[in-house]
Amino acid sequence: MELDAVGKAIVQYHLVPLVHQANLGLEVTMHRVDAHGHLATTAHPQAFGSAQQNHQLRPGFSASALKFTTPVRRDIPALMAYLKGLNTAARRSLDADERLWPLSSTPVLPDDLTNVPLADVDQVSYQRRRDLARKYELQRLMTTGSHVNMSLNEALFTRLYTETFHQQYHSYVDFRNAIYLKVAQGLVRMNWLIQYLFGASPRLAVTDTTSRPQRSSVQHPDGRYSQVTGDYTSIDRYVAKLTAAVRQQQLLSVNDFDGPVRLRSNGQLAMMARQGVYYLEYRGLDLDPTSPVGVDANAVAFVRLLASYFVMMPALPAKMVSQVNAQADQLTRQVLGENPTTASAQAVPAVQVLDALADFVKTYGLPNEDAVLLKQLKSWVTDPKKTLSAQIAMQADPLAWALERAARYQESSNERPFELAGFTALDLSSQQLAQQALTRGVQVDVVDPHANILRLTKLGRSQLVVNGSGTDLNPQALTTVLTHKAAAKQILAEHGVPVPASQTYHTANQLIADYDRYVQAGGIVLKAADESHKVIVFRIMPERGLFEQVVRQLFEQTSAVMAEEVVVASSYRFLVIDSRVQAIVERIPANIVGDGRSTVKTLLDRKNGRALRGTAFKWPQSALQLGTIERYRLDSYHLTLDSVVSRGTQILLREDATFGNGADVLDATADMHQSYVQAVEKLVADLHLAVAGVDVMIPNLYAELVPEHPEMAVYLGIHAAPYLYPHLFPMFGTAQPVAGQLLDALFKNED
């Protein structure tokens, strides 16, 4: 088909890339169900907070329905990543016996549908749901699905209007409306094809075993709870049609219109023609049960491609719109009513449309991913058994099949609780903060995944967070200074707390030359001056050759090394949030404990095989290594990898304990004497820090700290952007909700 004037102008001004850069958002509704597929009887999860404020995770029509809403993204992978994170965060907040129903077809409903619990957000919305239940068929109200919200790139409108179309339209708004209108018309005309390709509800209810299967019972016009059709001839006629339907009591309100395409304004419907269409909402996607999030990126990409196509193609003549829409509605009824396992009567037209789209992609240089997608979709037309609806219809027991998937997706979401799907490029603390934010309805934008920079937005207020806990709650200058260990230690000393004596070296030879001095001192702590997790402790100095080897290896990783006196005590990390100590962990150096039967190697492998152990800073508990230091320590015990360690004997593989070298992390929040808590809180208050990690060596956490014995608490360091994850995933003890506490501090006055 030949391009219209808009399409030709787009080609002339090289604007095709802008056409394809639509802003996309998703709304996905899924039911919470129990292990047998019955609706969950629990209330909307408290973890999601206020339904009025959480616009990302809201209740749907029933109390069991959960509506996921993403922010706008231009990039489909980024959009899907956000939805994955949101879905995973929600799953982890469900009761232990709950999961998300993967089908648009209803799960097991009560015999008496009046017993379906309605969502009770507030009195007004609850009354509206009751009115809906009285007016429409309740089973249809209980079906679910996905909506694609789409707005075209505003730069496209601006450029076209400025260059060419300001003379042909009364206003910029009229021009925008005209483009949106022809895209809406096109999506309505192609609804039958979208449904053929992505329909996934052979029957309205999964428990229905007698009705003839269809391509989509939910999206079929007869499956919609309101039977009002939209008039897409003009914006005025669209508004008039819906307004009349409300006046004639066909609809309770304009929000009840559930046609496949909605024109959405940024205000009242009556003002749409004047204020303009804000975005289009395509409402015709069944849940995809092969995806944990209920949406396949291919479906979103296809809807976007259709929209791009119709932006550049001629609109229907106004006098033909109603007739063509009626024909499209009839075509949709025909295709959706077909047996999904058989060839469609519209297979030839379907292939023709896909071929036309393929030509469009090739001619105007759209991404190759679209060409690959169209080839795949074409195979679904030639072999209908590849379609989702056919796959479901061919199941001997669709209920059991859906339950198996629901259980599998739920289990998968909890396999690695320290990771957040869609956000795994971030560090662990940032992922945990993002999970809590998503759960609470805080929008999470990844500004820079490599630098772990997030922008969190709640009710219009934004906060930047670096490395999971670095925020503007702390003074910027001090935050920068504390990244340098020597400077941080000096600041601690200036505030009157005990710190170990130290000296900073800038070459390996300088440090090696002082070997004899440290032998006389009885030991040494070596720290990379710029990396908190590169620490080596020798309580007894090793032979000179090993010391030289270790020092040179350390200088290969850093430009400066701080040598520090050894403090013999237990190592604790105090986590301060909102100026209060919220969590404390003890760090025990990497070790194995013998059982009288297993070799050292077996004990190492067994400990490293635990669920939360893995690569340092990628897993909550870092794996034990066998490097120079660890082998030296084994030699000091006269052990080899094949030695059997006697029962109950602890072998320390290191004498330092950090989060990155295999240390055991134990929660000590409830055990620590309050005198140490008060001392740490006073220190951070004096420094004007709201968030901090404070490392303290304490011989006895139960003994009261007294001024006469300052050696009872020696401060090793302080961090303005401390790790959150060790407190969320300790090896032993209670996990502390520190990510949520940090969010509370960031948005203290927003609730």
Swiss-Prot record:
A single MF term (Gene Ontology): glutathione synthase activity
Keyword Cell division among record annotations: no
Enzymatic reactions: L-cysteine + L-glutamate + ATP = gamma-L-glutamyl-L-cysteine + ADP + phosphate + H(+); gamma-L-glutamyl-L-cysteine + glycine + ATP = glutathione + ADP + phosphate + H(+)
Keywords in alphabetical order: ATP-binding, Glutathione biosynthesis, Ligase, Multifunctional enzyme, Nucleotide-binding
Organism domain of life: Bacteria
EC numbers, comma separated: 6.3.2.2, 6.3.2.3
Pathway in which this enzyme or protein is active: Sulfur metabolism; glutathione biosynthesis; glutathione from L-cysteine and L-glutamate: step 1/2; Sulfur metabolism; glutathione biosynthesis; glutathione from L-cysteine and L-glutamate: step 2/2
Cited Pfam families: ATP-grasp_6, Glu_cys_ligase
Renumbered residue ranges of the record's region Glutamate--cysteine ligase: 1-336
GO cellular component: cytosol
Protein role: Synthesizes glutathione from L-glutamate and L-cysteine via gamma-L-glutamyl-L-cysteine.
Family the entry assigns: In the N-terminal section; belongs to the glutamate--cysteine ligase type 1 family. Type 2 subfamily.
Subunit structure: Monomer.
Name of this protein: Glutathione biosynthesis bifunctional protein GshAB
Organism whose genome encodes this protein: Lactiplantibacillus plantarum (strain ATCC BAA-793 / NCIMB 8826 / WCFS1) (Lactobacillus plantarum)
Native organism taxonomy: Bacteria, Bacillati, Bacillota, Bacilli, Lactobacillales
